[in-house]
């Protein structure tokens, strides 16, 4: 697990990255009630079938089974979405299902996001993050459609957008030192190893989907799609606005 990276050459304060972290925490605490507000969560999460059809879908709660104490385990139904369904690909980026979910995501965003913002600048980083998250959501929807699974199960979390951040990170800073925790020990490895290993694990874990399994509630398609999308999106935005021929702006000294 990554703990921190080398930021000695960072030149700007990552205001947008801080904003994203604060916004995720704000939504989780005040709107999701620490993950307990199922109605809000099911209203603004991304539902693959809604994205495919372009229409809002509402369903009744369903009983999944019973607990050891005999109580029913009920899965909430899909709620009416007060916004166009395609906008849920943005709202879902700022929602999480549990403490572990948001803590893990915010740790990764804290470690890797500031470097991408420093590289792209504040506005381009904001655009990059949102585009990566949307690309990840589309990858998840495509995976669900292709495998004909989880089409009515809401997906949420910043993981897809953060996967895009990690893709851009390993593209721009492949040899940046990242300190990772392995069992009880810490060691420093280059980014291409730390992030590359994470990506390989996502691919390996995603093979469970091919066997008809649900993947443990993890949207591996979003992780893989976000990671792969983050590289070209980052490259294009980094090139955006730069002079095509910098030599033309050069003037000889007097």
Regions found by a protein language model. Name each.
Residues 1-254:
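A detector for small-residue-rich transmembrane helices and their helix-helix packing motifs
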């Amino acid at each position: 697990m990554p703990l921190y990276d080398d930021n000695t050459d960072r030149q700007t304060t990552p205001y947008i990255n801080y904003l994203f972290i604060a916004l995720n925490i704000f939504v989780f605490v005040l709107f999701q009630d620490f993950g307990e507000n199922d109605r809000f969560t099911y209203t603004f999460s991304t539902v693959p079938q809604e994205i495919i059809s372009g229409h809002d879908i509402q369903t009744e709660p369903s009983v999944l089974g019973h607990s050891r104490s005999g109580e029913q385990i009920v899965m909430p139904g899909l709620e009416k979405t007060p916004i166009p369904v395609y906008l849920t690909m943005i709202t879902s980026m700022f929602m999480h299902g549990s403490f572990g979910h948001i803590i893990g995501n915010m740790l990764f965003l804290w470690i890797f996001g500031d470097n991408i913002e420093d590289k792209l600048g504040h506005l381009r980083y904001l655009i990059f993050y949102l585009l990566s998250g949307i690309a990840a959501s589309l990858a998840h929807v495509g995976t669900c459609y292709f495998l004909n699974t989880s089409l009515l199960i809401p997906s949420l979390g910043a993981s897809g957008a953060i996967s895009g951040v990690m893709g851009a990170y390993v593209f721009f800073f492949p040899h940046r030192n990242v300190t990772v925790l392995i069992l009880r020990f810490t060691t420093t490895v280059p980014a291409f190893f730390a992030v590359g290993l994470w990506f390989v694990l996502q691919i390996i874990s995603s093979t469970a989907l091919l066997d008809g399994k649900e993947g443990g509630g993890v949207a591996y398609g979003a992780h893989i799609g976000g990671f792969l999308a983050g590289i070209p999106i980052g490259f294009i935005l980094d090139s955006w606005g730069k002079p095509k021929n910098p030599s033309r702006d050069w003037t000889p000294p007097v």
